[in-house]
């Protein structure tokens, strides 16, 4: 079994969608996933996708600012790092961009969204 918290390991996948209920229906019926909703306070609801008891990904309503940029719904990977802030600095020093600065989410960890010099977007996370 892979240690998802190990530096450099893909650790999470997250769907940003314009239709949470439609996506829920699609993925539960196609893949047999179950879902569990959790409140994010002012940010709305976050849906966890599960296979049995194992959490395999998450889903949330696409933020308005992302939708206004014309982005289609998409899956985004998260890669585990030992230090989010140091990794963000390294991304910038190597020609990448920070799209969402480091932030903390209680019970989740510290994370940021970055873009490599070629334009590929991914999240980095230090799990709680």
Predicted regions located by residue number:
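Conserved beta-strand and immediately adjacent loop positions that scaffold enzyme active sites
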Residues: 12, 45-46, 76, 111, ...
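A short, local hydrophobic-aromatic micro-motif
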Residues: 11, 36, 57, 75, ...
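Short acidic, gly/pro-rich beta-turn/loop elements at beta-sheet edges
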Residues: 23-25, 59, 69, 87-89, ...
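Conserved short beta-strand elements that form part of the metal-binding/catalytic scaffold
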Residues: 33-72, 121-126
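Core segments of cupin and vicinal oxygen chelate
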Residues: 7, 14-54, 93
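Intrinsically disordered, low-complexity segments enriched in polar/charged residues with Gly/Pro
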Residues: 2, 33-37, 66, 89, ...
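Vicinal oxygen chelate
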Residues: 19-21, 50-55, 77-118
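N-terminal beta-strand motif that seeds the catalytic metal site of vicinal oxygen chelate
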Residues: 1-24, 74-77, 125-128
């Amino acid at each position: 079994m892979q240690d998802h918290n190990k530096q450099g390991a893909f650790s999470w996948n997250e769907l940003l969608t314009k239709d949470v209920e439609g996506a829920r229906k699609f993925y539960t019926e196609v893949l047999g996933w179950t879902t569990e909703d959790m409140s994010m306070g002012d940010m709305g609801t976050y849906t966890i996708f599960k296979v049995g008891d194992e959490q395999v990904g998450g889903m949330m309503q696409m933020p308005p600012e992302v939708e206004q940029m014309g982005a289609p719904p998409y899956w985004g990977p998260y890669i585990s790092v030992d230090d989010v802030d140091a990794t963000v600095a390294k991304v910038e020093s190597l020609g990448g961009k920070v799209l969402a600065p480091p932030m903390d989410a209680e019970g989740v960890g510290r994370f940021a969204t970055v873009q490599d010099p070629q334009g590929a977007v991914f999240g980095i996370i230090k799990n709680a």
